[in-house]
Amino acid sequence: MPEKIILLYSGGLDTSVICRWLAEQGNHIVCFAANVGQREDWAALKKKALASGARKVVVADVRERFVGGFVFPAIRMNALYEGRYHLGTSLARPCIAEAMIEAARREKCGVFAHGATGKGNDQVRFELTAAALAPEMRVVAPWRDRAFFSAIKGRTEAIAYAKKHGIPVKATAGKPWSSDENILHISFEAGMLEDPAARPMDDMFELTADPRQAPDRPEKVTVDFTRGAPAALNGRKMSPARLLAEANRLAGRNGVGRVDMVESRYVGMKSRGVYETPGGTLLMAAHRDLEGLTMDRDVMNLRDSLIPRMAGIIYNGYWFSEEMAALMALVEESQRHVTGKVMLELYKGNVTVTGRTSPVSLYDPMVASMDDDKGAYDQALATGFIRLHGLPLRAQAKRAPKAKTLRK
């Protein structure tokens, strides 16, 4: 039976073919696209969606929501997946899906469709977001539909289908990799990058200068934070999206933010990804340093122990879970005093912190001084401190000969 379906639409070949395929079955298709900071000709995208069979096209500008509500919270967590990936795509998907669900309710669509493949993480992220926010919605995933992928096995068949149905196709060859962009990053995968030993081509990178060709002088930058969230760059207060865009510009021209890694996908396989995250790399380095000045050691250790878990939750698509809400509450409390300014230098792919200040610093220069501290710290008290903390070690040493005898 024909249905009213909202399709997560990127303007690319796959979602354009899916749009026509669903429309050919008599369905009423509303294409939804989200502006998360990617470089896109939105008028051309709307025109292509209509040419692909859509009855209506909805474009939502969610840049501020994305940065303020998803990217900055991840920076406050210091969330890196497997210690390296800044989660650019992982953070964007729940933001996009949330906005899509809002549009679906306005348009009275009870079904949503997406173009994510059955091998990737995005299918999980989109559908888990819908499960949390709109459990009543049904999903259509053509790349998991045998009728679809038996007819459209790959790019060659998709191009032929598009030409047959009058869908504009920019090129038939394309670059030897695929990419996904938002205001936080660009990710590259597939094609030549499926060989984990293959060096990325120099002309692949779009946001960052080649560190070898970056300026020969360090560029000084300051970042201000309020309760762990970036608030100003070089003394200028800006909205979250504008601040991240400016951080991208500064860090990118200095070659900062490239990562090439093999990661563990949620669906079980290993995957090679190359990422450019210039502004995010700069902001997280500054944030991490300011925590050293303002954050209690034990609170930091507790939060740090949860970073892999938080990053995994984001990567796997559980942003809107109760577990994530509980962890966000912990992060909120941990960031209560992370307010201040960090001074940095950007130079040929490197971010170097050169100083930091805070009105709520835990650092006491008199206590830490190696010179005359005017009685601020009584060094004689260290004797008892060390003796008490050494008690377990002395007990272990005393037991050692007995344990050795028992092992014989």
Features from the language model and the residues they span:
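Nucleotide-activated chemistry modules centered on ATP-dependent adenylation/adenylyltransferase
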Residues: 2-8, 13-408
